[in-house]
Amino acid sequence: MAAAWGRFLSRAWLCRTAWQGCGRNYRAALCAELKRPLVIEEVTPRPVQPHEVRVNVHFCGINFADILACQGQYQERHQLPFTPGMEFSGMVLETGTDVSTVKEGDRVIGLPGFSGMAEECITDHKNLWQIPEKVSLREAAALPVSYGTAIFALEHRACTQPGETVLVTAAAGATGLAVIDVATNILQAKVIAAAGSDEKCQLAMQSGAQSSVNYSRGSLKEAVGKLVGSGGVNVVIDMVGGDIFLEALRSLAYEGRIVVVGFAGGTIASVPANLLLLKNVSAMGLYWGRYRQQNFPVFSRSLSSALQYCQEGRIQPHIGEVFELEEVNDAFLHVTQRKSTGKVLLSLK
């Protein structure tokens, strides 16, 4: 994917064209054609509906789902042209007549689905959460997807207990580092971080992991066994899939739990049911965004918890890189080439 994206990456694609209309225009990144670089265009604002809020966006998080959507490979398809961007932070500019949850000037995080990679975003008021006083807009933008997922995986799905050992793969990514942060500082669990390079393992250790494994050097199961013995780990949070998932599954202790969060390695493994039976282990999935429709109170609580933990200074999101809006294609390439660690943000100001 990185090579295909890179072939088309050219500053020539970063253009601005003024849309006809009145009022103050704003800039937005548009996916006008699948598998092509985004373009930056000037957009004429539309009126807010009674249930909607207009937000002055300061930062927008970049997620792999944004890139997949622009490649036409995401499970949710969008009509072209569209603006990617699943999460943002900013300040309320205007509210619809039926909105009472936020007011002009409030600092908020937003989960609009898409449309966040723009200087302004109009979204339903239910997609916004107020940012506590001690949390910066920059920090807040790094929280929703990564920490919402981490909290849900560890607390709601795996039911992680204090003192348990958690193995997390892709540990230097935004969600991986969030898992380390929450497991260590909120749940008082011990973390083994697994990543694909010594540099990424070092970052994971600096972020609170008790030990690390570079799985590009050999068997993950054998390396974990040397750290914990034959007993195994209690919880696995896996973002990689493929052979790494299978080795992590075989590293579980009796009644261990493995949570599948993603397939960054590109391969979806089949689960050997006999392994579940022999140790009475549980394998489960987590599509965090689905809870918005299926169980909104629980979904919302994961975001409120992330904001509160950050307000209290108990967690600290790691922001690896910040790009300007005009550099959005460079930011996408940075992620697809696996150069990124922690959260990658776009600055809209």
UniProtKB/Swiss-Prot annotation:
Family: Belongs to the zinc-containing alcohol dehydrogenase family. Quinone oxidoreductase subfamily.
Top-tier EC class: oxidoreductase
Pfam hit, one: ADH_N
Keywords for the protein's UniProt record, in alphabetical order: Acetylation, Oxidoreductase
Residues bearing the modification N6-acetyllysine: K35
Domain of life: Eukaryota
GO MF, one example: oxidoreductase activity
Matches recorded under Gene3D superfamilies: Medium-chain alcohol dehydrogenases, catalytic domain, NAD(P)-binding Rossmann-like Domain
Name recorded for this polypeptide: Quinone oxidoreductase-like protein 2
UniProt modified residues of type N6-succinyllysine: K200
PANTHER family in the record: QUINONE OXIDOREDUCTASE-LIKE PROTEIN 2 (PTHR43677:SF4), SHORT-CHAIN DEHYDROGENASE/REDUCTASE (PTHR43677)
Organism: Bos taurus (Bovine)
Cross-referenced CDD domains: QOR1
EC numbers: 1.-.-.-
The keyword NAD is assigned to this record: no
This protein's record includes keyword Oxidoreductase: yes
Classification lineage: Eukaryota, Metazoa, Chordata, Craniata, Vertebrata
